[in-house]
């Protein structure tokens, strides 16, 4: 582990101090905010870049949950329509996607609290032994969104039906799927949204450890 850390420190030389924001302009404010940013940064070969202009979609943060039943070796997936998957002109696949439970982190909220709340709102389940897995950037070339991924122990017998908030026009169907089946669907490309792919890969690598850890709790 010390060797790995040493290697990372040798590779990554730049920090926040090596990029300078020159200006920003709000282009649109709605469900999300769109800004135009101008910046410059240090170059690998030395010196400074020219002025770079980029549009950024400001989304903030989100939490996602690998809702896993260790006794049944099953994972809870939710299905809902996604306009981004419907809008792609070359896609002939259904825009109703199989996903992990997830939701946006509002100002003042903690990611772990959002994970627990969304589990109840989207799937009607209670989560215990919530464990932080990792946090990742979602397409940081043009989007500001940090996704916090958690794993949580659930009783899959609770998970059924259709859920979501009426005031947000949510229509979410709950599915209980064996872990190996969900992983196979991911490998076949049937589950193809980023955070679900990351989450199911993480679960495949760590499910045995979760089973042992939760058994002791």
Swiss-Prot record:
GO biological process terms, semicolon-separated: nucleoside phosphate metabolic process; ribose phosphate metabolic process
EC number(s) given by UniProt: 3.6.1.13
Signal sequence bounds: none
Binding positions (Mg(2+) 2): 118
Annotated InterPro entries: NDP_pyrophosphatase, NUDIX_hydrolase-like_dom_sf, NUDIX_hydrolase_CS, NUDIX_hydrolase_dom
Record: residues binding substrate: 31-32, 54-55, 82, 104, 139-141, 145
Class of enzymatic activity (EC top level): hydrolase
Catalysed reactions, as listed in the record: ADP-D-ribose + H2O = D-ribose 5-phosphate + AMP + 2 H(+)
Binding locations of Mg(2+) 1: 102, 122
Protein name: ADP-ribose pyrophosphatase
Name of encoding gene: nudF
